[in-house]
Amino acid sequence: LLEDLPLKVFAHNVECVPRLDSIVRDPRASFEQSLKILRYAKEIRPDLMTKTSLMVGLGETDEEISEAMAMVRKVGVDMITLGQYLQPSIRHLPIDRFPEPKIFADWDGIARELGFRAVASGPLVRSSYRAGLLWEEAMGGEPVVTRGSTGSAVSHIISAGSATSAKVENP
């Protein structure tokens, strides 16, 4: 299917860390299945940029985020976005935490160290966040964070003191 399509980017979201699959995702989907899809897309079309996204604030640990990014990168994914999960309604999963912007900046750095060609990491980032700028970065342009973004990829934020996460209590 991908062989004949004039795509530049194939995007498929892993959504959450593997441990939370059964809580967050539809039972027909999984982190492992998403990895296979992303790997397969890259095998069929090595020229195709691949992108995925992770939501945070669902109960994962910082270490699990780093591990998930490493797993995604290992299958050849080129671009990644990380953003805060926001509970759409009371019927949806509650928010577990709101990581401080400094933690998003740390994840941005980890993703770059892992070799992602483009990264957007921040509380307001969504899976298609500034897709054009992310594409330009992946093609060798300026990192998204140097474009004057507000609240998006926040690796430019330097926080005095230690980074913390605010735990959220839901009624």
Put a short name on every predicted segment:
Residues 15-17, 85:
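Short, acidic/turn-prone active-site loops that include or flank metal/cofactor-
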Residues 6-11, 19:
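Structural/interface elements that position substrates and couple domains in central-metabolism enzymes
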